[in-house]
Each structure stands twice: as structure tokens, then as C-alpha cells.
Amino acid sequence: MSELQIVVLALIQGLTEFLPISSSAHLILPSQLLGWQDQGLAFDLILNIGTLSAVLIYFRMEVINMSRAWVGSLRGKGETQDSRLAWWILWSTIPAALIGFFGKSLVETYLRSGYVIAVTTTVFGLLLWWADANAKQVKTEYQTGLKGALFIGFAQVLALIPGTSRSGITITAGLMLGLTRNGAARFSFLMSIPIIAMASGYDLLKFILSDEYVDWGPLFLGAGISFVSAILCIHVFLILLNRVGMMPFVIYRLLLGGFLFYILSGT
């Protein structure tokens, strides 16, 4: 893998992982347009570590407060808004973790295609538009509730289908529950921490069991690029979200879906 490929793919991962526009829809473009081959387990792992580090550092105070409060709740010190949020994040992770563990091979066998990505990019983009247009926007992430967290968690299962966008579908679900745009986005980003961590652990296990040779030097460049681009993306997205809403991302998804259909029809 050339340094150009590493830079481009790391930028795509970092810039699209937390925006509601589907990272898989963008990662398919280099292979379709430039003929780039699959980057391999080690590269997937290193990019996940980069984006995981970004969200952990950006939300470090929230993570510290939730962790302390969660441990306190286990010790019988009572509930706080941080301990409740921590429990909701954990509960919301279970559906995708279970279904992903048992159904990942089925998804990769039957749903990992360019046309599936084009369809899901378009359809779930329209669903995001509908949810944003009809959202009450009266709750923060601390008012999600257990039922709401589970609803968002089951919505996250749909992100196993390539092109759906994990952040997109979970923000959509949050808006449906009446969360503010910022609250839905923050809950989505916080719940990405355990799911990305588990995906990284899974990739690490597969890598350990494989005999893949890796030149780690260039890959750490990819980790750094995905980290910096992801943390900047989170920051700018949360600042602009209430100003611009979801419509720019919806329009972008529709254009991207149409473009994917176009290039796939020519292959």
C-alpha cells in the first residue's frame, strides 16, 4: 500500500466516521474509481484505533465522569445523571454487539456490495431528513432513558448493513425520540466508544491469528491522520449542527447515492 493510499483512506475514515454520511460509502470509491485493493486487517485495525482515540480524547471529561459514576453505582453509592447515561450507553451497545458477532459473516457475504451501499446511502439519508424535519428536540442525552437507549441501540444494528452510517442511523433514532440535534449527536458519539472498541478487539484477534506481514511505520501515519481528522470533524460538526441542521448531509447522501449508482452501472 502506497503512502498516497494510506493518506487518502485515513482521511476518508476520519472525516466520515462521525458524520451521518457513511464511511463505507466513501471507502468504496477508491476501489471503484482507482482500482485499489482491500487494505487488509492491520490497516482496518489502525484506523479504528485512530478514530477511537479521537472520540475518547474529545469526550474525555464525559468519559471520566461516567466511568466514576458508573463504578459508584456498582458500589451502591446511588445513581447520578452520569451513571444513568453510562448504563444507557452500555445497554444500547448490546443489540449491535450480539447481532454483529453472530451475523457479521452473513452481512459480509450477502450485503457487502456496491449496490447495497448505494441504496442504503439514499434510503437512510431520506429517513434522516424525515426525522430531522419532524423532531421535537426537547431532550438532552441525559434524558434519553433506558427504553430510548435500547431503541437507539437496535437502530445501530442497521449500521451493520454497509452504507447505512452508524452515526447517521443513531442520530436519526435519537431525533425520533425527541432529542435535540446536539443531544442525539453526543449520544451517538458516546455510544460509538464501546462498539468501535469491540470492533478493534475483533480485528486485533483476527490479525493475531493471521499470518499477515505488516510494515507498521506507514500504518501509524494512517492512525495519526484518522485521529486528527476525526477529532476536528467531531468538533466542527457539533458547532455547526444547530446552525445548518441535517439537510446538507441529506443532500450530500442523495448525491453520493446517485453517483454510486452511476459508477456501478458502468462497471
From Swiss-Prot:
TM annotation in the entry: 1-21, 39-59, 87-107, 113-133, 144-164, 189-209, 219-239, 244-264
Record keywords, A-Z: Antibiotic resistance, Cell inner membrane, Cell membrane, Cell shape, Cell wall biogenesis/degradation, Hydrolase, Membrane, Peptidoglycan synthesis, Transmembrane, Transmembrane helix
Catalytic function, reaction form: di-trans,octa-cis-undecaprenyl diphosphate + H2O = di-trans,octa-cis-undecaprenyl phosphate + phosphate + H(+)
GO cellular component, one term: plasma membrane
GO biological process: cell wall organization; peptidoglycan biosynthetic process; regulation of cell shape; response to antibiotic
An example molecular function term from Gene Ontology annotations: undecaprenyl-diphosphatase activity
Protein topology in the membrane: Multi-pass membrane protein
Source organism superkingdom: Bacteria
Its EC number(s): 3.6.1.27
Enzyme class: hydrolase
Keyword Cell inner membrane: yes
Compartments, record wording: Cell inner membrane
A Pfam family it matches: BacA
Note: Bacitracin is thought to be involved in the inhibition of peptidoglycan synthesis by sequestering undecaprenyl diphosphate, thereby reducing the pool of lipid carrier available.
Family: Belongs to the UppP family.
Protein role: Catalyzes the dephosphorylation of undecaprenyl diphosphate (UPP). Confers resistance to bacitracin.
NCBIfam families found in the cross-reference section: PRK00281.2-4 (NF001393), undec_PP_bacA (TIGR00753)
Protein name stated in the entry: Undecaprenyl-diphosphatase
Lineage: Bacteria, Pseudomonadati, Pseudomonadota, Gammaproteobacteria, Alteromonadales
Name of encoding gene: uppP
